[in-house]
Amino acid sequence: MDDLSLPCPDPDLDATVRYGPVDAVFVPGNTLPPQHLIGNVNIVPFVGSDAVVVRVAGGRPEIPGGTLEPGEDYLAALRRELREEAGAELRSWTLLGAYRCHSVASNPYRPHLPHPDFYRVVGFGEITLVGQPTNPSGGEEVVEVSLMPIATVEHLFRQWQRPDIAALYRLAMRIRGSA
């Protein structure tokens, strides 16, 4: 991935993020990593000037997205995840970059996924809310989909100790404002 004109990310995006056995470092850019190395996708979604946040059971806010299914490309996965987690359809997509991930687990999260090194592609886009989240079995249960001003979103994710996600929303808003 190349840094090809995106604004310099803030310090909250420079830190390594650890989730379970995976360390992830955000690499800004507008060039996709090779498809065979993409294991996950996330979107900072907007409806007009408001950001969209989903909350899962227990109240934790999340950025919509998830793991690619066998044979699925990242855009198909993104569309599926938006239906499942936000009851939404994708209208536009702009790449922000990707997390370069390394897992110390002995096996991949799922057999079809790249391992031990892979990418979590992240972008932003406009969505249309068309219904309730489908909440398929085996996934996180989304209990709320909310539209919020960006300052509220940032505060919310910081409260939940996720300054990295707050920074992704902030970066997406900054790029949208300059377009």
Spell out what each predicted region is.
Residues 89-99:
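A short coil-to-beta-strand element that immediately follows conserved catalytic motifs
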Residues 38-40, 56-58, 63, 116-120:
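Short connector loops at helix/strand junctions that flank enzyme active sites
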Residues 101-133:
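Active-site-adjacent beta-strand/loop module that shapes the phosphate/pyrophosphate-binding cleft
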Residues 27-29, 37, 74, 79, ...:
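Short acidic (Asp/Glu) patches
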Residues 43, 95, 123-125:
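A structural signal for short, well-ordered beta-strand segments
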Residues 1-42:
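Acidic, metal-coordinating catalytic segment for phosphate/diphosphate chemistry
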Residues 121-126, 134-167:
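NUDIX/MutT-family hydrolases
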Residues 46-85:
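Conserved Nudix-box catalytic region and its N-terminal flanking loop in Nudix hydrolases
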